[in-house]
From Swiss-Prot:
Assigned keywords, A-Z: Chromosome, Developmental protein, Differentiation, DNA condensation, DNA-binding, Nucleosome core, Nucleus, Spermatogenesis
Organism: Anthonomus grandis
Subcellular location: Nucleus; Chromosome
Highest taxon of source: Eukaryota
GO molecular function, one term: DNA binding
GO process annotations (BP): cell differentiation; chromosome condensation; spermatogenesis
Protein name, per record: Protamine
The family this protein is said to belong to: Belongs to the UPF0771 family.
Region Disordered: start-end pairs: 17-46, 96-115
Primary site of residence: nucleus
InterPro entries referenced in this protein's UniProt entry, alphabetically: HMG_box_dom_sf
Function in brief: Protamines substitute for histones in the chromatin of sperm during the haploid phase of spermatogenesis. They compact sperm DNA into a highly condensed, stable and inactive complex.
Distribution of this protein across tissues and organs: Testis.
GO cellular-component term (any): nucleosome
Amino acid sequence: MGLGFKCRHIPPSVYCGGKKRRRRRSKRRRSRCGRSRRRKSCRGGRKTNNPFLNYLRVFRKKHCGWPQCRIAIEGAKCWCKMSGRDRKKYYNQACSMLKKRGRRRRRRSCRRRRRSCRRRRRRRRSCNTCPK
């Protein structure tokens, strides 16, 4: 406490040792030589079988410059305030995606690869556990 009291009456050059404080420059102020500013992409993403996510996709396009956390919070508030009529559009989109979901087929080659890998693993494990 006594030291703090003395510092008030002593000039800063004496008790600070005459050190000058360095100013910190923020990274934003540095000049970008020859770089053009990139525009944030407003791509919403693909349609899903979730009506709320379909709504957020549209909301994200309207509010392009906002951060993702703010888009999620504000979008949820707007979704809660929406009437059933307005939401129906997004429910219909979700239903149409459920119908399209059954049309997709997987490649057979991927299944074969996975099975062969599993067989190899099983063989290795079985050999390691067998007493010799």
